């Protein structure tokens, strides 16, 4: 609510004797009065809260991925064995399936983990036959390659897949040294001073590759403006390929609204973390917070 209302212009018809202001605009001038802002945020928050359940229940699923239904080649027979074990476990413990899953997939390079993960996620889905998850990679340069692999190896269409590509260097997952933190904070403060309220910053700066599809009407009501389509695709597409730092914003953001999209995505989406052994112990602490969420 705060993020959306902060992007709006001042209400010229707002009547108030209050001399306190809530934020500034890009021109560094005072914008919304405090009481105007608080009332607007409350109204917007109430409206959005009524949609939260729909973010979980009305997002898109990939159903007919034919390759995942087929038997794996002999050298990758372990993929089907993993799926069979999951199916057997679910059949034997049907009364406890409301709980979450924590699965570790260990296999050597070239043994087919990419397709195996997709098969496993399909087996773990609520109906056992669909896909909806985030594939979080360790290296940004792999996102396009993995997106291509999903398109070609799994036969997934552009309407089922979104690939998030960053334009800047991969950020460290855990907090950097104190001196670097201070320098970064000063840069952020300068940026906020230049562009106005931190709540009005973009939710998703990076480029997102996706094909436009019809979105639920409620998403068009929640996300407005020139970046609405990108935000909607980030949330709506059945499979999202990105680097893990994009999802880390859900737990590591301390100011601004960068946590909003990854948090909403995780309401309805499973999470696959690729090559987790590439991360150092400090990174794993931050990853643990993400898994716990």
Predicted ranges, named:
Residues 1-68:
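N-terminal accessory nucleic-acid engagement/regulatory domains that precede
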Residues 97-104, 130-132, 236-238:
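Pre-Walker A (Motif I) flank of P-loop NTPase domains
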Residues 97-120, 279-280:
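Walker A/P-loop
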Residues 120-147, 155-159:
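Conserved SF1/SF2 helicase motif Ia
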Residues 247, 260-292:
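SF2 helicase catalytic motif II
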Residues 151-238, 244-246:
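A substrate-engagement module of RecA-like helicase motors
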Residues 58-106:
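Conserved pre-motif I regulatory segment
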Residues 107, 166, 275:
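The Walker A (P-loop) glycine that initiates the GxxxxGKT/S ATP-binding motif of P-loop NTPases
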């Amino acid at each position: 609510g705060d993020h959306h209302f902060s992007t709006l212009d001042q209400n010229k018809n707002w009547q108030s004797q209050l001399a306190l202001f809530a934020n500034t605009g890009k021109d560094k001038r005072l914008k919304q009065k405090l009481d105007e802002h608080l009332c607007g945020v409350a109204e917007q928050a109430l409206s959005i809260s009524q949609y939260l359940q729909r973010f979980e229940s009305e997002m898109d699923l990939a159903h007919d991925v034919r390759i995942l239904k087929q038997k794996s080649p002999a050298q990758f027979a372990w993929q089907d064995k993993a799926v069979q074990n999951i199916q057997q476990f679910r059949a034997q413990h049907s009364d406890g399936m409301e709980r979450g899953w924590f699965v570790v997939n260990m296999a050597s390079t070239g043994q087919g983990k990419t397709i195996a993960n997709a098969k496993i996620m399909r087996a773990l889905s609520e109906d056992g036959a669909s896909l909806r998850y985030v594939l979080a990679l360790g290296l940004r340069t792999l996102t396009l390659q993995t997106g291509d692999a999903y398109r070609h190896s799994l036969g997934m269409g552009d309407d089922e897949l979104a690939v998030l590509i960053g334009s800047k260097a991969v950020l460290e997952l855990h907090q950097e040294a104190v001196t670097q933190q201070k320098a970064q904070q000063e840069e952020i403060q300068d940026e906020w001073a230049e562009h106005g309220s931190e709540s009005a910053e973009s939710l998703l700066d990076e480029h997102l590759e996706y094909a436009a599809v019809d979105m639920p009407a409620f998403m068009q009501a929640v996300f407005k403006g020139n970046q609405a389509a990108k935000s909607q695709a980030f949330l709506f597409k059945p499979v999202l390929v990105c680097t893990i730092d994009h999802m880390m914003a859900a737990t590591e953001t301390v100011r601004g609204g960068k946590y909003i999209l990854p948090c909403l995505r995780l309401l309805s989406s499973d999470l696959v973390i690729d090559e987790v052994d590439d991360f150092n112990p400090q990174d794993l602490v931050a990853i643990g917070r993400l898994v716990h969420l």
